[in-house]
């Protein structure tokens, strides 16, 4: 019996030891789990927030372009950082939105999953503006960090300084985007864009007290033959299909734009020295879209039409020339005079506002029926206009 009790006690001791060992392993595993969780939480709290930075080698190749853009993008300008990554600088004014996109090839993002889209104002008190930072050749490093939904941290390093600022975010700011659908596409090479800018320069520099903002530029696109005309009160410029002006999709269209807005949009496209694509979006307010792209930068300008309020001097000049022609040719053959007046009507009627304030709609129907090359020119019956130009390259 003593032997049986000894075996029972030994078995009970083994069971208690096994249970104690099992509980010890559970406690040890629980402690390890909590320690790992605490270490992970501390690591997450102490690790760097997601950071967006420039590849400095690529940035140096576009520094001069960014310096030019800094002069063009000043007022009403916002900067948006996206996790693609990309940086979108957008400026808005009346009837014109300009957009500069710095592509992913020029940027580095440490954590695409945790970096959220953020928008700030271009104006940063400590640095004057964001555009001034990225166009400054003395900058050696620049970081944009996301560690709060309310602000963006900007860190800038130059040769002898290191500065950071917390910039408040702008909420509710929309980025204008191209829908990609257009019935019109015309590509102008860089030299053609430069020619149009030179042609616009005298118009936009004209000083008229209180009327400088009302200077208009009309863009006329015609199908047969494919041509694009730039028309102002002072002169006109015309291009036909060539290796410098390529018509991909053509539709009879007319745009009434601010001359200054058109000049600024073309100036944006001219900075990166590539071809400029003219497209349109068929909407309530018809937009003309100008786009230029390089490997690292994309420029877009969205222009909406201006309302023609009154008859322009260029239109009045055409009417006066009609009157002079009638008086100077009153002894000519009647059929020849009627033919000349009909031709003049074809040329100038699209610029004369209709009674309801909109432009006449009969130009393109008549233009398509006419195969005469003369109908593409302004044929003044008095002295010819020396400022009229026709470009066929």
UniProtKB/Swiss-Prot annotation:
Organism in which the protein naturally occurs: Human herpesvirus 6A (strain Uganda-1102)
GO molecular function: DNA binding; DNA polymerase processivity factor activity
Keyword DNA-binding included in the entry's annotation: yes
Biased composition (Basic residues): 31-41
Family indicated by similarity: Belongs to the herpesviridae polymerase accessory protein family.
Protein name (database record): DNA polymerase processivity factor
Chain residue ranges for the region called Disordered: 25-50, 311-339, 355-393
Ranges that cross the membrane: none
Database matches in SUPFAM superfamilies: DNA clamp
Composition-biased stretches (Basic and acidic residues): 311-333
Highest taxon of source: Viruses
Gene3D superfamilies the record matches: 3.70.10.10
Role noted for this protein: Accessory subunit of the DNA polymerase that acts to increase the processivity of polymerization.
Chain's gene name: U27
Keywords of the record: DNA replication, DNA-binding, Phosphoprotein
GO biological process terms, semicolon-separated: DNA replication; viral genome replication
């Amino acid at each position: 019996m003593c032997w049986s009790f000894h075996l029972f006690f030994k078995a009970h001791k083994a069971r208690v030891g096994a249970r104690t060992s099992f509980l010890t392993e559970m406690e040890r595993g629980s402690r390890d789990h909590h320690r790992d969780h605490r270490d992970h939480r501390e690591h997450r709290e102490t690790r760097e927030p997601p950071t967006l930075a420039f590849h400095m080698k690529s940035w140096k190749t576009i520094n001069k372009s960014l310096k030019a853009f800094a002069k063009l993008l000043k007022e009403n300008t916002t900067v948006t950082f996206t996790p693609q990554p990309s940086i979108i600088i957008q400026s808005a004014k009346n009837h014109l939105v300009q957009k500069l996109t710095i592509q992913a090839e020029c940027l580095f993002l440490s954590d695409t999953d945790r970096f959220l889209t953020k928008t700030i104002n271009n104006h940063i008190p400590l640095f004057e503006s964001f555009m001034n930072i990225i166009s400054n050749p003395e900058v050696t490093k620049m970081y944009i960090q996301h560690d709060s939904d309310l602000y963006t941290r900007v860190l800038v390093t130059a040769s002898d300084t290191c500065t950071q600022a917390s910039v408040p975010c702008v909420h509710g700011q929309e980025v204008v985007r191209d829908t990609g659908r257009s019935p019109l596409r015309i590509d102008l090479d860089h030299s053609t864009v430069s020619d149009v800018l030179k042609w616009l320069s005298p118009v936009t520099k004209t000083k008229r007290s209180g009327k400088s903002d009302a200077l208009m530029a009309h863009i006329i696109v015609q199908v047969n033959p494919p041509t694009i005309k730039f028309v102002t009160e002072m002169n006109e410029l015309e291009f036909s299909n060539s290796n410098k002006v390529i018509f991909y999709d053509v539709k009879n269209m007319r745009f009434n734009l601010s001359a200054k807005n058109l000049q600024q949009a073309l100036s944006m496209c001219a900075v990166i020295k590539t071809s400029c694509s003219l497209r349109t979006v068929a909407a309530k307010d018809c937009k003309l879209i100008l786009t230029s792209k390089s490997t690292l930068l994309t420029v877009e300008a969205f222009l909406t039409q201006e309302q023609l309020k009154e008859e322009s001097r260029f239109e009045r000049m055409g009417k006066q020339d009609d009157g002079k022609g009638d008086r100077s040719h009153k002894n000519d053959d009647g059929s020849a005079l009627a033919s000349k007046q009909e031709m003049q009507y074809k040329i100038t009627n699209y610029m004369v506002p209709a009674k309801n304030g909109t432009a006449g709609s009969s130009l393109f129907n008549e233009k398509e029926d006419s195969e005469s090359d003369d109908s593409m020119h302004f044929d003044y019956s008095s002295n010819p206009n020396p400022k009229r130009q026709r470009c066929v390259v």
